[in-house]
């Protein structure tokens, strides 16, 4: 056979082998996808993320001990719900308040380990409101605990505090016509240090973090610097509410969680009629001036947050955040219909999903399940949108019945929410 024909025959054989190889690979891929499809939970399964780990290290198991300092009006309820659901899926114990504290750890008192219900000790996860006390948390939580918190831009946060706590904070009740502008024009005319719930009217972030909210960085810059150092010594991650999805990407990477573990529904959100569409610049400046300690904390940790993003790779974090948003939309559609809408509490038929309303002047929105139904998917969707008080009560009942033993999940029961009462590790240490 002429050489040219021999080369042609060899080339034909090579092409046939490649086609066979591609066909085998294709069939294997389809088979794998079909197999995975049979195992799909209600959480969307994502292909492995393309972002590299934060450090060149072998894969870590998911970290199971987390303390989240839930600050006020910072999207903390949504983060809490993420942690509650993670704890349930992994059969972890969640620290919950003693009944005398209701659904917060006796806030605004300094946290004490005695505020924790005995049926929820020793805990893996803590995520309810408290005023930070490092020594008491060290007594309660395991040494491997990772500490995280979240901050929000002080002007936007203060507008939310003023609206939400208008009927509870004496300083806010004194303001004619419930006018935020009037309060910020002369806050000293309405504010009285030491009054019950006074911390909601002045430097609330600093107070939640265990600081003295009456200090002013203009008069004592060293105090702000010292408070920042204390926060940095304890918290491995300070999330930023304005960059919520990016914060969750950093959180899941810190804890070696999957992106599925941080999917969420936005909780405890006010109706548009209950909030300012936009805070005027002059009002924002006045709010930051009055809450100068909070402004200093936020500005510092906002800058720190973006340094974390840069170390992780900004393009990588943005890509993961986009994947998170897409997966979240799929999840919400699956649970609440093609157009999931936040609804007023009066329009929510499912009692377990009716959010508590702080006053007649504020509408807190929630979700509802489309029609009846039962089974794991409905139960999971219910937990995704369950308000804080109902979920806390449910977990407490479950953990009390468990009595330390690992029991099967129980169904969620109706439980109308009550009115509210008035050196740690820098990162994960093993599994």
UniProtKB/Swiss-Prot annotation:
<feature type="glycosylation site" description="N-linked (GlcNAc...) asparagine">
    <location>
        <position position="110"/>
    </location>
</feature>
<feature type="region of interest" description="Disordered">
    <location>
        <begin position="399"/>
        <end position="431"/>
    </location>
</feature>
<keyword id="KW-0460">Magnesium</keyword>
<dbReference type="InterPro" id="IPR027417">
    <property type="entry name" value="P-loop_NTPase"/>
</dbReference>
<feature type="topological domain" description="Lumenal">
    <location>
        <begin position="41"/>
        <end position="431"/>
    </location>
</feature>
<dbReference type="GO" id="GO:0016020">
    <property type="term" value="C:membrane"/>
</dbReference>
<dbReference type="GO" id="GO:0030309">
    <property type="term" value="P:poly-N-acetyllactosamine metabolic process"/>
</dbReference>
<comment type="similarity">
    <text>Belongs to the galactose-3-O-sulfotransferase family.</text>
</comment>
<comment type="pathway">
    <text>Protein modification; carbohydrate sulfation.</text>
</comment>
<keyword id="KW-1133">Transmembrane helix</keyword>
<keyword id="KW-0735">Signal-anchor</keyword>
<dbReference type="GO" id="GO:0050694">
    <property type="term" value="F:galactose 3-O-sulfotransferase activity"/>
</dbReference>
<dbReference type="GO" id="GO:0009311">
    <property type="term" value="P:oligosaccharide metabolic process"/>
</dbReference>
<feature type="transmembrane region" description="Helical; Signal-anchor for type II membrane protein">
    <location>
        <begin position="20"/>
        <end position="40"/>
    </location>
</feature>
<dbReference type="GO" id="GO:0032580">
    <property type="term" value="C:Golgi cisterna membrane"/>
</dbReference>
<feature type="glycosylation site" description="N-linked (GlcNAc...) asparagine">
    <location>
        <position position="302"/>
    </location>
</feature>
<dbReference type="GO" id="GO:0030246">
    <property type="term" value="F:carbohydrate binding"/>
</dbReference>
<comment type="function">
    <text>Transfers a sulfate to position 3 of non-reducing beta-galactosyl residues in N-glycans and core2-branched O-glycans. Has high activity towards Gal-beta-1,4-GlcNAc, Gal-beta-1,4(Fuc-alpha-1,3)GlcNAc and lower activity towards Gal-beta-1,3(Fuc-alpha-1,4)GlcNAc.</text>
</comment>
<dbReference type="GO" id="GO:0006790">
    <property type="term" value="P:sulfur compound metabolic process"/>
</dbReference>
<dbReference type="Pfam" id="PF06990">
    <property type="entry name" value="Gal-3-0_sulfotr"/>
</dbReference>
<keyword id="KW-0325">Glycoprotein</keyword>
<keyword id="KW-0333">Golgi apparatus</keyword>
<dbReference type="GO" id="GO:0009247">
    <property type="term" value="P:glycolipid biosynthetic process"/>
</dbReference>
<keyword id="KW-0808">Transferase</keyword>
<feature type="glycosylation site" description="N-linked (GlcNAc...) asparagine">
    <location>
        <position position="91"/>
    </location>
</feature>
<dbReference type="GO" id="GO:0005996">
    <property type="term" value="P:monosaccharide metabolic process"/>
</dbReference>
<protein>
    <recommendedName>
        <fullName>Galactose-3-O-sulfotransferase 3</fullName>
        <ecNumber>2.8.2.-</ecNumber>
    </recommendedName>
</protein>
<keyword id="KW-0472">Membrane</keyword>
<dbReference type="GO" id="GO:0050698">
    <property type="term" value="F:proteoglycan sulfotransferase activity"/>
</dbReference>
<keyword id="KW-0812">Transmembrane</keyword>
<dbReference type="InterPro" id="IPR009729">
    <property type="entry name" value="Gal-3-0_sulfotransfrase"/>
</dbReference>
<feature type="topological domain" description="Cytoplasmic">
    <location>
        <begin position="1"/>
        <end position="19"/>
    </location>
</feature>
<dbReference type="GO" id="GO:0030166">
    <property type="term" value="P:proteoglycan biosynthetic process"/>
</dbReference>
<feature type="glycosylation site" description="N-linked (GlcNAc...) asparagine">
    <location>
        <position position="177"/>
    </location>
</feature>
<dbReference type="GO" id="GO:0001733">
    <property type="term" value="F:galactosylceramide sulfotransferase activity"/>
</dbReference>
<dbReference type="GO" id="GO:0050656">
    <property type="term" value="F:3'-phosphoadenosine 5'-phosphosulfate binding"/>
</dbReference>
């Amino acid at each position: 056979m002429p050489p040219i024909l021999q080369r042609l025959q060899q080339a034909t054989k090579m092409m046939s082998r490649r086609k066979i190889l591609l066909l085998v690979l294709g069939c294997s891929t389809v088979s794998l996808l079909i197999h995975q499809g049979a195992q799909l939970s209600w959480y969307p399964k994502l292909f492995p993320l393309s972002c590299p780990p934060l450090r060149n290290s072998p894969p870590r198991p998911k970290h199971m001990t987390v303390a989240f300092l839930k600050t006020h009006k910072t999207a903390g309820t949504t983060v809490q719900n993420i942690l509650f659901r993670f704890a349930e899926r992994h059969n972890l114990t969640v620290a919950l308040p003693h009944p005398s504290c209701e659904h917060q750890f006796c806030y605004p008192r300094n946290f004490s380990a005695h505020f924790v219900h005995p049926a929820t000790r020793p805990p893996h996860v803590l995520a309810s409101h408290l005023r930070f006390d490092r020594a008491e948390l060290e007594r309660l939580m395991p040494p491997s605990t990772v500490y995280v918190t979240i901050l929000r831009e002080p002007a936007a946060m203060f507008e939310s505090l003023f609206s939400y706590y208008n009927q509870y904070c004496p300083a806010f009740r004194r303001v004619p016509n419930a006018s935020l502008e009037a309060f910020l024009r002369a806050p000293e005319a309405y504010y009285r240090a030491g009054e019950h719930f006074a911390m909601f009217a002045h430097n609330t972030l600093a107070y939640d973090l265990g600081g003295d909210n009456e200090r002013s960085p203009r008069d004592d810059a060293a105090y702000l610097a010292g408070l920042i150092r204390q926060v940095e010594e304890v918290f491995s991650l300070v999330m930023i509410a304005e960059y919520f999805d990016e914060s969750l990407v950093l959180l899941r990477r810190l804890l070696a969680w999957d992106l599925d573990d941080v999917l969420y529904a936005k909780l405890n959100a006010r109706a548009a009629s209950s909030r300012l569409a936009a805070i005027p610049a002059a009002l924002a400046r006045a709010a930051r001036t009055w809450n100068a300690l909070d402004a200093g904390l936020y500005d510092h940790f906002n800058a720190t947050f973006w340094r974390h993003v840069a170390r992780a790779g900004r393009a990588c974090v943005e890509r993961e955040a986009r994947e998170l948003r897409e997966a979240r939309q799929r999840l919400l559609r699956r649970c609440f219909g093609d157009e999931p809408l936040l609804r007023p509490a009066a329009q929510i038929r499912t009692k377990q999903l009716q959010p508590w309303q702080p006053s007649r002047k504020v509408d807190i929105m929630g979700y509802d399940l489309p029609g009846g139904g039962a089974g794991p998917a409905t139960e999971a969707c219910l937990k995704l949108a369950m308000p804080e008080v109902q979920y806390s009560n449910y977990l407490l009942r479950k953990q009390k019945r468990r009595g330390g033993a690992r029991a099967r999940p129980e169904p969620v029961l109706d439980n109308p929410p009550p009115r509210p009462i008035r050196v740690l590790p820098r990162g994960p240490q093993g599994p």
